[in-house]
Regions:
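Bacterial Sec-dependent N-terminal signal peptides
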Residues: 1-23
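Exposed, flexible binding/inhibitory loops of compact, secreted disulfide-stabilized domains
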Residues: 17-142
């Protein structure tokens, strides 16, 4: 009986060690950019300034915090999440970024509002430490 109990305990411990841990990954939200090319993939990992400049432009505004967020591609990369253009008010917000089983999992929230008189493209850009650059990015809507 003792051997069976020891065996079962060992199996449980071994199995629990193989379960992927979910580790939060720090990120910074990039502000004051606009989409240049609206025909982009819905999730985009960008690792260089030239690639970033191909998809996004600077949208500086006057006043406090009017400058675009600085991105240093020697130490960072970005993940952008875009939705199709819409004439509805749409809020797109990152919830968290986690590392799990060799992947980065980007969770986000979408809130759809009333119809507008204009068309806009909801998006956000997050800045992530370059040490996570090799990870594949998957997404999860909450």
């Amino acid at each position: 009986m003792r051997k069976i109990l020891l065996f079962v305990s060992s199996v449980v411990i071994f199995c629990s060690c193989n379960v992927g841990k979910v580790v939060p990954v720090d990120y910074e939200l990039a502000n004051n950019y606009f989409v240049i090319n609206p025909r982009l993939p819905s999730t985009l990992k960008i690792t260089s300034q030239s690639e970033f400049d191909h998809y996004f432009g600077l949208a500086a505004v006057m006043g406090k915090n009017g400058e675009p967020t600085t991105i240093d591609f020697t130490r960072q990369f970005v993940i952008a999440k875009l939705l199709p253009e819409s004439n509805r008010a749409v809020g797109l917000t990152p919830v968290n970024l986690n590392r799990s089983d060799g992947q980065l999992v980007l969770s986000y929230r979408v809130e759809r509002g009333k119809q507008q008189q204009w068309v806009s493209q909801p998006f956000f850009i997050i800045i992530v430490d370059k040490k996570y650059q090799k990870y594949n990015v998957t997404e999860k809507m909450e």
